[in-house]
Amino acid sequence: MPTKLENFTKQLHAVWLPSFCLDEKRKFDPAGFKNASIILSEFDASNFLRAIDSGLVLDTGGGRYQCLKSSAQEQIFWEGLKSVVPRPLTLWLEPVITMGTIARLSLDFGWPADVLGMQSKDWAFDFVVYQSPTSTKEHISGEVKTTAVQCDKLIADLQTYGRTGAIEPLSENPRHKNSFKKWQSLLKSRANLLWVVGPDDYTHLFEIQYGPEKTASFLKTTLDRLQSKCADQINTS
């Protein structure tokens, strides 16, 4: 019986890559795809397939994917230099994990499709769970990183910003500026939970307690708190 990764790879070559390459706005040669870029765990391959097969993530054509609660469209291929022929294409791990996480939120934790979105309104976070289909209030803000180290660094930055009530990035380092953008987004959205997701089920979930002077505490909690039935408990506490 084929593994989930084998099924993923088969569909990539048979469906997703041709759709992406043959789009009128691209016209790429599929031969440019680098098979070595399929560095994906069974866990992540399985969840991506669940997202597509369940219809939680909609294939809008031309290799573009979208959720019901957001207008943002994602793609799963990274485009290399135009000057190289055929143009190099690689699998883009971050959106693959993001879409798989959308599947987990609905199929494992009970959230309806119409509260799930990819990309927050300010583009600070990769995925969002809204409080209701008609609400713009974020209950869960989520970020995907392609390595465990990147996850840990983001968490450390946000904990520092929250503890100090930071009003500027820790430095001009792009990483610090990016994490500061997320900190500012959380202060504005007042999301209840932060879910940081890495490859192969590397994950950290935090309840956010907002304090005075633009401070916040990130309290690590279990994935049980992701259950949709827990939302009312958090929102009314």
Predicted regions and their residues:
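A short, conserved, highly charged catalytic patch centered on acidic carboxylates
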Residues: 1-193, 197-237
